[in-house]
Amino acid sequence: MSSASRSLARLAALALAALAAAPLAASAQPKAARGKTEVTWYGHAAFVVTTPGGTVLAIDPWLSNPKAPEPGLAGKLPKVDYILVSHGHFDHVGDAIAIAKRTGAKLITNFDLGSSLVAAGYPKDQAGMDTLGNMGGTIQAGDAAVTMVTAVHSSGFTDEKGTGHPGGNPMGFVIQVKGGPTIYHTGDTDLTQDMKQLPERFGRVDVMLTCIGGHFTMDPKAAAIAVGYVHPRTVVPMHFGTFPAIAGTPDELRAALKGKAEVRVLEPGKPVGF
């Protein structure tokens, strides 16, 4: 075999090896099964959304909450691209800083809270003007668009030393997945007339992740009214039962809805496709 033939043979072998490796590299990225968007509840208001394109969004990642399916989850998530924090309270900021340091996840929240989280240790280069915003703003997050929408609550942030910092305005999130569902995470909120505008602005909401616990947020009766404003295909209750004070239940939500919407209670740690 001539030197030219040997070179061509080596190139062909390298090309075949690259083609064989390509599926392995692709499979290392967490993509939702069969082109669906996977939503995993980790208890309280904490969710991880994985899009068909492999973008991973962690919402209000208090993964050490009492309903979490196992301990140490903040150190076990294989990939997080973006962390969405609805407001500054400890049970929503949760493990955001630890997850960000380990995964390189960018922060999506209001500008004031973002600045306070950076001061508390969130990596500054992962919390810039490209992902910090405010009410009404839309952030492109891979193959998902995240819009910050109204929530009626409070948002003070207290760091590990007990020092208070500005938390900006609380918010919910509307996540529009390219070629996939529109997901509305209410954040912590009371019933608000602004919810009526969501279908006009975003079209049909496929999945509404709604607080129902009461005391600090809507109770099941108010959440049922909110569902009537938004008209989602599926309602997923959250922010209930973590503490004795937030005593609203999914059964109470179902009763208040009177069959007007599907209520789907997720099992912590088990992904569900939409």
UniProtKB/Swiss-Prot annotation:
GO molecular function: hydrolase activity
Top-rank lineage group of the source organism: Bacteria
Disulfide bridge positions per record: none
UniProt keyword terms in alphabetical order: Hydrolase
Entries under Pfam families matching the protein: Lactamase_B_3
Entry keyword Hydrolase: yes
Cited InterPro entries: Metallo-B-lactamas, RibonucZ/Hydroxyglut_hydro, UPF0173, UPF0173_UPF0282_UlaG_hydrolase
PANTHER family: UPF0173 METAL-DEPENDENT HYDROLASE MJ1163, UPF0173 METAL-DEPENDENT HYDROLASE MJ1163-RELATED
Family classification: Belongs to the UPF0173 family.
Name the UniProt record assigns to this protein: UPF0173 metal-dependent hydrolase Adeh_1068
